[in-house]
């Protein structure tokens, strides 16, 4: 399933990005099982491939992923409408880490007005391990 089918959750988790010898710190603004919008002072260029570690505060664990920059706000304004940062698409991420993101996104979004099809898409990732309770009939 493509990133456009998963809803984006406003989860603000600390991120450390490694790009060769350069290390960049940031924070996720939105996150889903396939991609993340990361706010950082110096976004990378399009198509750069990075190694990243996302710290999941509530679970006291981190997620490691290899990702590609698919959008970068390097030169635009840095304001509430268009915050300085970049969107990365996960190229390599373990299925367990993808499930952690899906579960946290689901928990964050289930009380909001989100298309039920999109919530069900998150559930398909989580249900393999039976980590959420089924919906009441």
Q: Where are each of the predicted segments found?
A:
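Short, well-ordered loop/turn sites that connect or cap secondary structure elements
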Residues: 9, 44-46
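Short conserved beta-strand and strand-loop elements enriched in small hydrophobics
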Residues: 13-17, 48-63
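Short beta-strand-centered aromatic/proline hotspots
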Residues: 26-28, 64-73
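Short, conserved beta-turn/loop elements at beta-strand boundaries and strand-helix junctions
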Residues: 33, 72-78, 95
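Short, solvent-exposed secondary-structure boundary/capping segments
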Residues: 37-40, 74-89
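Short, charged, solvent-exposed linker or helix-capping segments at domain edges/interfaces
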Residues: 80, 96-104
